[in-house]
């Protein structure tokens, strides 16, 4: 490790220990870092840190060394001293150092090329050369973009020697101590010193770091550090207690800028064989916010033991790892003409374990380009090979870095972390975390190892827990794939989420865990490749102990394997589990049209949210599939109650116009000029084969007036109520109608009639199954109609015989009918335009009494609707189409009427029986009238 020094300083000796061998020859064994950190050639060819920006703060880079990376970027920066001297710091400029050598006649200053930075940079990114020794492997991250900045300003060799002599003269007056005192160390310490010279040095390091940060580097290697002052951390803490208050320290400001820029800082621990590292590696102890961005580097030898010279991790253990420190590095040796001769030399020091770590960060950044700097750091730390005492210890920290393991993903996160995945990826390492992990990004992340997690939040994309996983709490707002995933406390999901089951078992709820289901569900297609009807494809949720679940799914993603074979995957919501089972469609060969439509709907509903939650319907579905017990639900879901009601309404509107014809007939053959009358009708229809009963009640108030012998006007206001009853439904149809009629007699016994009808209706219905309310709703509508009729009158022997033919046009409109309920239907607004042909014949005989008369009569009407044989409607339940049709056809209807009218003075009364014949329905009307 390079020690902070000027030309030389007796209290700050060079820490990078060099064997200073001559340039490596072909016979020499080369010490490469790759085997020790388990970076194989195949792995190195795959991940070389390509494109990752790294920084090195050092000096003596020897940028013309032929083994240097082609991606080396020397930087230039400048600094003005308090005296106004402008210093230029050019990393490409050759730099010299002088070494004092004691002789009999004094101390001689021997100059040499400074090569420390070259050795550091080479470990990171040097090109390989298999012709050197037994094979030089080059840098660990050959593809990295390497930015280098120096802390030594441009000086000629003469200037370097001159400055060294001045330092040597100043040093003669100081006590020559093997171990400097704490006060003397404080005077010369980079962070603690208040000396002017050290202030300038702090500014030099800060200026270089800031220049590197200007280039947006991912990590900065720092193979420099003040001496470790003590093995006792309490002594260290007391020594550096003042730095926390020094807010104007430019070096600390640069360090903080790196943290704010999400740049990692790697610091060599130092080479004093102390139990505590140098202060730069301890900075998170005094500034906890730095821990996520800093790594302390110790060195191990080729036996993977702590190197004899290396400081221990000590108090930096939680952010400390080890790497090889005994390596061959790039060097240049000046010849007699002071021109550099380039090659390799073997050196030792944490100066060289640090760049091995920095380069490894670049390799991991290329591998996990979507991870943050801290997450890359945590990956490197937590995948290290444990050395020394088990776990994170004071000597090795997390252990020896292991790239073979690290490229398979982190084994821990050391803070709450958000993983924003920008490409599909697999992590095969086991992952354990006591912190919250949040998955973001629209791509998939697969955790293939055995995982023990605290809190997982899936916010975006897909997280696949392929390996055996235990987790306390999961919140799923995107896509979570599980395979026997054990939940200890809680699983929650949103309506936009998807749960994907990868294996025979999905979620396992332990202890008192609660599973709250929502969103969609997907069963992996491979689970149904060989399944047959009746096979269980997966257990979606399994409850243990006192665990519970609630909610359900909005969708079960269609399975291609089953769809091709005409099979359906159903979910069975049971007390202690939710299973997915393969079944055939529901069938009933004996079902009628509405029953078949109901079956089609029920099969369609098996793929809707109604089927994907714990409910009576899901219980019925299980019974229907396992025991073939339909319980006539395929009839109950039908909306034929509405179709029957609309068919009845259309028929009723036709009958209203026909009644107006009867009123005109009665008024014309009444001796009074003006009559006012009231009428009440009751009807009961029964169609046993259709399981339909209709009760009809109607009250009318009318007025008739003869304008002349040939013309009669009639107006009728009616209120009617129909009650329909079916085994699984009931409906009430109310209507208020106004009919206005005109009868005019032509010449030669011909007559014509015209009638207009205006009506408003209100409709209510309720559908049920056992004790369950399937749906209930109400709606309103209107009717506009008219009839034109022409007839002929015969009057033989006091009989009145009137055959006639009418044509009706009726528009019936109903607003949309939208139910609420467990299987609610949604039906759009309806409009029917009917054209009816209505032939009719009426017979009446009048017998005169002393003060009145009695008139028996018979009427016969026939309706034939020209457009549409039967009312059909289309509804939907849960987005699935349901076709329903009326069970009683009323498009052709025969109506017979027998009655008697009694006239006494100015009073009239009438009673009649009305018999209507439609297919499978025989209604009887009982009518009473009172005329005045």
Curated annotation (Swiss-Prot):
GO terms for biological process: protein processing. It is found in: Cell outer membrane. SMART domains: Autotransporter. Pfam families: Autotransporter, Peptidase_S8. GO terms for cellular component: cell outer membrane; plasma membrane. InterPro entries: Autotransporte_beta, Autotransporte_beta_dom_sf, Peptidase_S8/S53_dom, Peptidase_S8/S53_dom_sf, Peptidase_S8_Ser-AS, Peptidase_S8_subtilisin-rel, Peptidases_S8_Autotransporter. Keywords: Cell outer membrane, Hydrolase, Membrane, Protease, Serine protease, Signal. Gene3D superfamilies: Autotransporter beta-domain, Peptidase S8/S53 domain. Belongs to the peptidase S8 family. This is Serotype-specific antigen 1.
